Amino acid sequence: MQLLQSSVIAATVGAALVAAVPVELEARDSCTFTSAADAKSGKTSCSTITLSNIEVPAGETLDLTGLNDGTTVIFSGETTFGYKEWEGPLISVSGTNIKVQQASGAKIDGDGSRWWDGKGGNGGKTKPKFCYVHKLDSSSITGLQIYNTPVQGFSIQSDNLNITDVTIDNSAGTAEGHNTDAFDVGSSTYINIDGATVYNQDDCLAINSGSHITFTNGYCDGGHGLSIGSVGGRSDNTVEDVTISNSKVVNSQNGVRIKTVYDATGTVSNVKFEDITLSGITKYGLIVEQDYENGSPTGTPTNGIKVSDITFDKVTGTVESDATDIYILCGSGSCTDWTWSGVSITGGKTSSKCENVPTGASC
């Protein structure tokens, strides 16, 4: 009898010990979140996340950082943000092999008019940046419809990222919107932006550092055009292997631009502007300047940043009558090995202030 009781007790204790061992639960296939707090706390619990009509509280970030590898994020309905003067970002996303997309009819609305005061990031209200895409590697962002960012749109610091068919519509900010850059790229490799449609009041694209970056099939309206730079004065001051092609820039201050920082060091190399069409440009159709200091041109170029192996191929179109067709202001010996083919920009003035124009280019 005692032996039987001992056996029963041993079996019971053994079962209890087994039950006490933690069991690792697999992530559910899909989750739908209706609040930013739930999304933040539950984002690693599902392989597919649907964000349904999220109202992000004022002063908070829709935190999608540290997602599990292979997660799909779907924006559904309307995503909105409470008002507060702060730096942001309104959204942040990171992870590997992530897919970010939206359901049919969805929109992400920053309602930037609450912050717009004509000063952008240079004073007035403190405005939140829209979206940090930092360490979003081997991933994709597809088909997002974004409206009214308070200031800059996407801050990109990632590797192997494809951004496809994204619309950023800040057309409502024509009067008071400022510094509403669409895509700011830095310290990134293998970034491909294809089919972007942008209405804004600053750079459609600004590449400050990075390599193997492409921007193609873009439409840029109302801003400052397609820019390399400004390059210099950062921890990473190299831009190389960039192709900007088959795009339109309309009703903008500049068409295509390379700008480097006064008295800084760095490299801009193997950059191609190909098949770019311009219209309604109000300042410069094509501009390369090596004189930026504190965000403004000085008129005096320096040569610490080499701008070499640059291609301008079939950059064509018109500027306004009081604009300048082409302006090239290079430091002594710093702009070399340019290819200049099929460039035809008309309608404006011819600059008398070009300096150190590379062989083959015209100003």
Curated annotation (Swiss-Prot):
Residues modified by glycosylation: N162
UniProt xrefs under Pfam families: Glyco_hydro_28 (PF00295)
GO cellular component: extracellular region
Disulfide bonds: C31-C46, C204-C220, C330-C335, C354-C363
PbH1 repeats: 158-187, 188-209, 210-230, 239-260, 268-290, 302-347
E.C. designation(s): 3.2.1.15
Maturation propeptide residues: 21-28
Keyword Glycoprotein: yes
InterPro entries, per database record: Glyco_hydro_28, Glycosyl_hydrlase_28, PbH1, Pectin_lyas_fold, Pectin_lyase_fold/virulence
GO biological process terms on file: cell wall organization; pectin catabolic process
Catalytic site positions: D202 (proton donor), H224
Classification via SMART domains: PbH1
PROSITE patterns recorded: POLYGALACTURONASE (PS00502)
Record's keyword terms, sorted: Cell wall biogenesis/degradation, Disulfide bond, Glycoprotein, Glycosidase, Hydrolase, Repeat, Secreted, Signal, Zymogen
Main location: secreted
Induction conditions: Expressed in both pectin- and glucose-grown mycelia.
Signal sequence coordinates: 1-20
Subcellular location: Secreted
GO molecular function: polygalacturonase activity
Catalytic activity, reaction form: (1,4-alpha-D-galacturonosyl)n+m + H2O = (1,4-alpha-D-galacturonosyl)n + (1,4-alpha-D-galacturonosyl)m
The protein's role, per its UniProt record: Involved in maceration and soft-rotting of plant tissue. Hydrolyzes the 1,4-alpha glycosidic bonds of de-esterified pectate in the smooth region of the plant cell wall.
Family: Belongs to the glycosyl hydrolase 28 family.
Protein name per its UniProtKB record: Endopolygalacturonase A
Species assigned in the record: Aspergillus flavus (strain ATCC MYA-384 / AF70)
Upper lineage: Eukaryota, Fungi, Dikarya, Ascomycota, Pezizomycotina
Gene: pgaA
